[in-house]
Design a protein with these regions (language model features):
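N-terminal beta1-alpha1-beta2 module of alpha/beta enzyme domains
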Residues: 1-98
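A conserved active-site cap/scaffold subdomain adjacent to cofactor or substrate pockets
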Residues: 212-235, 240-241
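An alpha-helical appendage that flanks or caps ligand/catalytic pockets
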Residues: 2-5, 14-24, 152-188, 236-342, ...
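Conserved, mostly hydrophobic/aromatic
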Residues: 30, 58, 62, 70, ...
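Acidic (Asp/Glu)-rich catalytic clusters
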Residues: 22-25, 59, 86-94, 117, ...
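Flexible, glycine-rich active-site loops centered on histidine and acidic residues
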Residues: 25-44, 106-174, 226
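Hydrophobic faces of well-ordered beta-strands that scaffold small-molecule active sites
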Residues: 30-34, 66-68, 98-100, 128-132, ...
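Active-site mouth loops of central-metabolism enzymes
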Residues: 34-49, 103-111, 200-210, 318-327
């Protein structure tokens, strides 16, 4: 297939991996954002096993995607290497789309990302998404260690150039005379054109992720799908989505905008239990924001914590954007959010100390919307 400058392959194959139809009574397709959270008293092994169970459960219940986020130097988040985790999830699933939500492009050489996601596409043909962000996903010192440079703005400032380079590697179409013209990302298209080669898998669709206007504008100008981090930047959601739609230019990938929003949502069997779990997750966020990252505390630890006035103000603001409660309450909140934003897809992240609580939340939401239940 032909390729455009940034969007990649043309035709229906690219769009098929992006657009989806709602299931049950859900207002949009529903998907999963997995931070691979590690609770106090638990290990990274426990968290990764929960992720496998969650991916299998999400697939069976009709969730459309399972994305893994990239974060570094955070004891309570075990998703420092999305590509490795996604390869493991691919071995345990057969239909659900798997992707990065996202890979932080400035932290990596574009060629390495092209090779990693070419490998993932070879492992799970036709169901891999490449979500890209420009934030470091960590603090400044860790970002410097990842990039082997103390010029922290260097990667973010030339994000459009990095994106163009990554796309060239994915499509194997550097122009003649370019320094990288003889370099090929493998697995990739070069294998199709080599002697004895056969058609290689379609390369993963690129998504741009963001929490402000920069990525919204860039995604619109390039005609790419856009994923907005409503779960930690709710005040910017509507302006960013408006900007994306206003600047959108039809491309080889999409003929109309497609906007996904990440939503923090936790459903439990009991409303009070939801409040307890959300408070514990909020305490974890307070500690992260004040330079004291740790494992996600238990609800009991959060109840015993002596909150300062500043911490209480932060938590009140933070929790106001977490949709939580019983399944009916969460369904109502998601319906309202979809209506207010016009989002094409909702991606839910359930942050809690316990993996069982997280798994139960996705089950309850699926039940509330009448999603498929093979049991």
């Amino acid at each position: 297939m032909a390729a455009d400058e940034h969007g990649g392959e043309t035709g229906d194959a690219a769009a098929e991996g992006i657009r989806a139809e709602p299931k049950g009574t859900a207002p949009t397709p529903l998907s999963v954002l997995d931070l691979v959270t590690v609770g106090a008293g638990r290990t990274a092994t426990d968290a990764l096993r929960t992720s496998v169970t969650l991916a299998k459960q999400a697939e069976s219940r009709g969730y459309h995607r399972h994305w893994v986020a990239e974060h570094h130097s955070m004891p309570g988040v075990a998703s420092s290497s999305p590509a490795v985790i996604l390869a493991h999830l691919a071995a345990h699933t057969t239909r659900i789309r798997l992707g990065s939500g996202g890979v932080m492009l400035p932290n990596h050489a574009p060629l390495v990302i092209a090779e990693q996601f070419g490998t993932l596409e070879a492992l799970a043909p036709g169901r891999v998404d490449l979500g890209l962000g420009r934030a470091p996903g960590t603090d400044g010192a860790t970002a410097a260690a990842l990039r082997r440079s103390d010029q922290l703005n260097e990667g973010a400032d030339d994000f459009p150039q990095q994106l163009a380079e990554l796309t060239r590697f994915l499509d194997d179409d550097f122009p003649d005379g370019h320094p990288y013209a003889r370099i090929h990302a493998v697995p990739g298209p070069v294998q199709s054109t080599s002697p004895g080669g056969v058609q290689s898998p379609h390369r993963p669709p690129i998504w741009l992720l963001g929490s402000s206007g920069f990525s919204a504008r860039l995604a619109g100008m390039l005609g790419l799908p856009f994923a907005f981090a409503h779960h930690f930047s709710a005040q910017n959601t509507l302006p960013a989505l408006d900007l994306y739609r206003d600047t959108f230019r039809p491309s080889a990938v999409l003929d109309a905008p497609y906007a996904l929003i990440g939503v923090s949502a936790l459903a439990t069997d009991d409303e009070n239990e939801a409040r307890r779990q959300v408070m514990a997750a909020a305490l974890n966020m307070v500690r992260l924001r004040t330079g004291r990252p740790g494992l996600v505390p238990t609800p009991e630890e959060a109840e015993a914590h002596q909150f300062t006035e500043m911490e209480r103000d932060f938590i009140t603001s933070w929790n106001s954007n977490v949709i939580h409660g019983t399944a009916d309450q969460v369904r109502s909140g998601l319906d309202d959010l979809a209506k207010r934003t016009g989002a094409d897809e909702l991606m839910l992240t359930a942050n809690a100390h316990s993996g069982d609580i997280r798994l139960r939340s996705y089950e309850l939401v699926a039940d509330a919307y009448g999603l498929p239940n093979p049991a």
